[in-house]
């Protein structure tokens, strides 16, 4: 297939049509019974099949959401009014849909098949991408088979990835998730400017057998460069300055700055300005993943995402999993007013997945201004949070079941675990996941609680005291994502599903999901305060709180 960049124009949607569709949806939401999930199951014995979609072994079950067939019809009308399909095509054709930075958004190109062509500014992106992938594969295989050695001639057995944000969250999450596929060096991750992070990591490593990846597009990210300099001095103090070129590689587009650091040009892995940080795991930022699991498994990871890309691009509206997922997210956030969503992977190796989605979702859709420069008149992206099951059950599930706020839950489940000899134990995990989903939906009435308490021998007076405390309202919405096994392919597909879901939610909200000016603002202020904190500048024209905090910190340091 051949793709071609189509220019910068991005159509402006018909706001009157969208507002009419949204108001129709809001009116529908006020009707009795729409949110009554229990009743929906009673009235439709085939609700599961009517309200679920499949893509090979991926099951997307949204039957436990407070919606009806009419809700789906109105949501589809909303998608048409928002021009979801047109905006989708704009992304796939290379239009500059990141309007504030005038950039194309082409992380999808990073996982395109090798025989496809995607022309942008006279270059075939697929060929450029494959060249970088081949570079990554050659280098990673040399490290993995021991032919690439450190400065003393010893084999590299530890990798330290130094990055932050998308240069850390994605690589760390994926590397941890794919632990059963590790047959390469041990991988460590350093991101925080807290000196404890780099110090604790280096304390257990041998300089002679350690390789550092410095992951920074601009090679100016403050936290990353600070940690990189500490690592550089650590190598120099043990092995000498000449060892830097053997013990450091970079993922960056700033070739001059990387060269100044002392990294050989043959060990610089390129990526492009159309790769956003939170979408960069598919690029050379994934080098640490490839070092851990090998090139073949990394390509399977890309293939899984590619399958979801293809489904997102060609599946009709009513059968399109990312679009349906996004419409439900919009329904929950904007129409129902649910302020957060809980991501609960019943997979310990996906324990970092909620944190990964926090950046992917909240950095993308935590916006208050529309594409046409107007303040939004509804709530934008939800707070995203979560933890792995069953751990979360013993921490915050109490609030999910009986708290005053309704919080939609997104369960992620795999039918099988990698530890086949522990299969009976894995059944406990699966049973708990299914039980929590059912409990949130079904609840337990006061009458049922009374019957249970009386049957257990508790007297009537005590029963009345306990009944309300032990009852559950139910009708709490949840979505279930089920796949066979956590593999490079299924993980890639899962991440791409969430990427496209978040993109479509941004379309519905009419915002730019691909900039992050709030993050940039924080960096700007930190750069202003740093020389003041170090006593190099005076603290003029600051608010009293900032001045007071600076004075307190400096005074305590001098004691």
From Swiss-Prot:
One example of a Gene Ontology biological process annotation: gluconeogenesis
CDD domains: SIS_PGI_1, SIS_PGI_2
Known catalytic reactions: alpha-D-glucose 6-phosphate = beta-D-fructose 6-phosphate
One GO CC term on file: cytosol
Chief location of this protein within or outside the cell: cytoplasm
Gene3D superfamilies: 1.10.1390.10, Glucose-6-phosphate isomerase like protein, domain 1
Molecular function (Gene Ontology), one example: glucose-6-phosphate isomerase activity
Pfam families found in the cross-reference section: PGI (PF00342)
EC numbers on record: 5.3.1.9
Active site: 363, 394, 523
Pathway assigned in UniProt: Carbohydrate biosynthesis; gluconeogenesis; Carbohydrate degradation; glycolysis; D-glyceraldehyde 3-phosphate and glycerone phosphate from D-glucose: step 2/4
Swiss-Prot/TrEMBL keywords: Cytoplasm, Gluconeogenesis, Glycolysis, Isomerase
UniProt key word Cytoplasm: yes
Compartments reported by the entry: Cytoplasm
Family matches, as NCBIfam families: PRK00179.1
Family designation: Belongs to the GPI family.
Classification via HAMAP family: G6P_isomerase
Function as written in the Swiss-Prot or TrEMBL entry: Catalyzes the reversible isomerization of glucose-6-phosphate to fructose-6-phosphate.
Protein name as annotated: Glucose-6-phosphate isomerase
């Amino acid at each position: 297939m051949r793709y071609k960049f189509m220019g910068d124009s991005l159509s402006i949607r018909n706001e009157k049509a969208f507002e009419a569709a949204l108001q129709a949806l809001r009116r529908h939401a006020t009707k009795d019974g729409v949110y009554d999930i229990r009743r929906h199951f009673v009235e439709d014995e085939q609700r599961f099949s009517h309200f679920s979609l499949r893509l090979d072994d991926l099951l997307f079950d949204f039957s436990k959401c407070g919606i009806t067939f009419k809700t789906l019809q109105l949501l589809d009308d909303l998608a048409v009014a928002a021009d979801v399909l047109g905006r989708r095509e704009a992304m796939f054709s290379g239009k500059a849909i990141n309007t504030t930075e005038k950039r194309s958004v082409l992380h999808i190109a990073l996982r395109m098949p090798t025989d496809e062509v995607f022309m942008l500014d006279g270059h075939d992106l697929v060929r450029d991408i494959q060249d970088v992938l081949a570079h990554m594969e050659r280098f990673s295989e040399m490290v993995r088979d021991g032919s690439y050695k450190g400065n003393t001639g010893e084999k590299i057995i530890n990798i330290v990835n130094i990055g932050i944000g998308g240069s850390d969250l994605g690589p760390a999450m994926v590397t941890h998730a794919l632990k059963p596929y590790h047959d390469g060096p041990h991988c460590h991750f350093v991101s925080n400017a807290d000196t404890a992070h780099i110090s604790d990591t280096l304390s257990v490593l041998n300089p002679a057998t350690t390789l550092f990846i410095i992951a920074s597009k601009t090679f100016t990210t403050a936290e990353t460069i600070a940690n990189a300099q500490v690592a550089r001095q650590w190598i120099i103090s043990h092995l000498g300055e000449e060892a830097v070129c053997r013990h450091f590689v970079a993922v960056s587009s700033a070739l001059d700055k990387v060269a100044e650091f002392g990294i050989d040009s043959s060990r610089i892995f390129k990526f492009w300005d159309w790769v956003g940080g939170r979408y960069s795991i598919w690029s050379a930022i994934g080098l640490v993943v490839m070092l851990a699991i090998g090139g073949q498994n990394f390509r399977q990871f890309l293939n899984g995402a590619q399958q979801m890309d293809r489904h997102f691009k060609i599946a009709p509206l009513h059968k399109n999993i990312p679009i349906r997922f996004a419409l439900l997210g919009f329904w929950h956030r904007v129409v129902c007013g649910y302020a957060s969503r809980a991501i609960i992977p019943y997979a310990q190796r996906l324990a970092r997945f909620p944190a990964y989605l926090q950046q992917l979702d909240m950095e993308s859709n935590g916006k208050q201004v529309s594409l046409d420069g107007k303040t939004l008149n509804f709530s934008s992206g939800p707070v995203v949070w979560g933890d792995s099951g069953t751990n979360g059950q013993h921490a915050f599930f109490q609030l999910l079941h009986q708290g005053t706020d309704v919080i939609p839950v997104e369960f992620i489940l795999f039918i099988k675990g990698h530890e086949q000899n522990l299969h009976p134990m894995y059944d406990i995990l699966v049973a708990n996941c299914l039980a929590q989903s059912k409990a949130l939906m079904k609840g337990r009435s006061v009458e049922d609680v009374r019957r249970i308490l009386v049957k257990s021998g508790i007297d009537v007076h005590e029963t009345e005291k306990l009944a309300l405390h032990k009852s559950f309202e139910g009708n709490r919405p949840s979505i279930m994502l089920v796949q066979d096994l956590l593999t490079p392919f299924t993980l890639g597909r899962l991440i791409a599903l969430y990427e496209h879901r978040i993109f479509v939610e941004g379309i519905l909200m009419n915002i730019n999901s691909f900039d992050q000016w709030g993050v940039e603002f924080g960096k700007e202020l930190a750069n202003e305060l740093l020389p003041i904190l170090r006593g190099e500048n005076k603290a003029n024209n600051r608010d009293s709180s900032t001045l007071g905090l600076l004075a307190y910190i400096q005074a305590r340091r001098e004691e």
